[in-house]
Amino acid sequence: EIAQCLVGSEMCIRDSSYLMSSGFEDIVSDQDFPVTERLSKWGAHDHLVFNRLLEDLKTEAAEGTAEEKTPHFRVLQTSSSHEPFEVPFRRLENDRLNAFAYTDSCAGDFVRQFRELPQWKNTVIVFVPDHLGAYPEHIDNLSVERYRIPLLMVGGAIREPRRIDVYGSQHDIAATLLAQLALPHEEFVFSKDMLNPASPHFAFFTVPDAFGMVTADNQVIFNCQAGAVVVDEGTVKGKNLPLGKAYLQKLYDDIAKR
């Protein structure tokens, strides 16, 4: 098995103890790139990090170890789409949107080349942002749009193209992936399989002093410090407020037991 984390910035160094305790054996950070390639505020630009991962995959394929070393779990975090949005690429006039287009092109190039390798047929690639917030500009923490992000799954192991319109949270990715692999996920007590029609489809998010609970029929954000609802939208207004409060309490109860 392979467990690898690749980040072009110093984040892997700062979080190395967490990553190692989580089972990552190979951690690639900005220090693993020549100084001449660390040209952004964050370290190495995204195309260099994707190229590093692609070279590792090509080496495994050439050595005939690609099949032997499965299953493998790799995490690559992009950084060029963060401020100051300076990238070696120019397609759009707006610097923010241009940086997003650059990272998108890096991911697309990686997928196109990865499709030619033997590992592709047994691989699932998950694309998910860690957060939204850089665009539209000036969006704040008390807006539902601040938390609306996509989840994309591609790869040779995907049977057919589909679009699934359900609400979920980042912590639901664990149960969703493990369920497709027929692996247990009970230890992830707050994670649910988003592809299971019997699962409740909702998203929950928190920021300091506020939480949000989102379903198809109601979107609520509650400011805990002010003790006030700041967003209540949808066809069944108010429905998710008590549910969100109960969920937040359950989170605190779980933390208290650890």
Where are these regions (language model features)?
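Active-site His/acidic residue clusters
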Residues: D32-V35, L53-D109, Q113, A134-P136, ...
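Single conserved hydrophobic/aromatic residue that forms the stacking wall/gate
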Residues: E1-G8, C12-I13
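Metal-dependent active-site segment of extracytoplasmic phospho-/sulfohydrolases and closely related
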Residues: Y102, C106-S143, L152, L177-P184
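Formylglycine-dependent
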Residues: R14-G64
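Structural recognition of the beta-strand scaffold that forms the well-ordered cores
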Residues: F73-V75, F127, L152-M153, A203
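Feature representing long, continuous alpha-helical segments
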Residues: H47, N51, E55, N98-A101, ...
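Loop/turn elements at helix/coil->beta-strand transitions in domains of secreted/extracellular proteins
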Residues: E63, E67-R74, Q119-I125, A157, ...
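Membrane-interface soluble catalytic domains
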Residues: T65, R159-R258
